[in-house]
C-alpha cells in the first residue's frame, strides 16, 4: 500500500512540475507562476537593463519569425552606418533584380527599377512599413548580394549569442531555414536598441508615407500606450502573428525609468498579438520592485527584488 501511495505522489509531483514549467518567472530569488493573458505559441518578457527573463513560455521553440527577421536586417544596416561604410543620405540605385521577387501580396513601399532612394528612406520603409523591397535593396547594398547579406546575418546572430537562429532571407518571407526563437529575439532586441538607440526614432513612427504610398504601423500599441516606443511586428501564414514590443515607464519610488521587452511568436490573430504584448509588458513592469540603498561609503545604488506573480 505504501508503495502505491509513493508512486501516486511521485506522479503527482511530476505533473505539478510540468505544469509549473510552462510559464515561469526567472529572478535572482525565486520562480513564480504568473498568468499573463497571452494566446501564442511562444513568448518571453525580459528586463531592459539586465536582460533577465521575467516570464517565458516555450521561449526556445524554433519558429519562422516573419518580418521580425528585419530586426537583424536593421541591425546590420545601422552597424554599417556607424562604421561609415554607408551614409544616411546616400542614394541607392534600385535594380530590377532587387525587387523582382517581391509579390503583390507582400508588404512593400512600391520601389521601381531605376529609381534612386536614400538609405534613410529605405530604413524608414524597412522598420515602419515592414517593406520587403526596402529589405532587399538594403541587403544588396550592405552585403553585395542576397547570399552575402545572409552570411552577415548569421555571423552576427552567432556573435550576439543567438544560438537557435538561422537566417535565409533579409525580409522574413517564409523560407526554409529561416528560423529563430522568442529568447533569441529578446537578445537581438536588447542589443539592437542599446547599440543603436536611433532605432527608436523609426520604430515609434505610427504612420509611414513615401510618395503616394501611406501605411499605418501595425504595432497598434503605439499611440494607445504612450510608454511604448517600438519595435516590430510580423505575419505570415507559417509564422502566425508575431511582435517584439518595448516600453519605458517611470516609477515613483525610487524615481527612475525602467524598460521592458516582450516577444510573441505564433499568435492566432493580430488582436491576440497586440493584446498579448500589452499584457506581457504590464506584467514585466509589475514583476520587480525597485528600491534604493545607500551603502556605508555613501554610494547610491538601486536593488531589484522580485514581487509575487499574479494569482
Question: Where do the model's predicted regions map?
Answer:
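Bacterial N-terminal signal peptides that target proteins for export
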Residues: 2-14
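Bacterial N-terminal signal peptides
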Residues: 13-24
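Sterically constrained small-residue positions within well-ordered secondary structures
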Residues: 21, 34-36, 253
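Secondary-structure junction/capping motif
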Residues: 4-7, 118, 145, 217, ...
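N-terminal compositionally biased, intrinsically disordered segments and leader/signal-like regions
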Residues: 25-28, 302
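Domain-terminus/edge residues, biased toward the C-terminal soluble/receptor-binding domains
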Residues: 162-166, 174-311
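Active-site-adjacent loops and short helices of periplasmic peptidoglycan-processing enzymes
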Residues: 28-183, 190-196
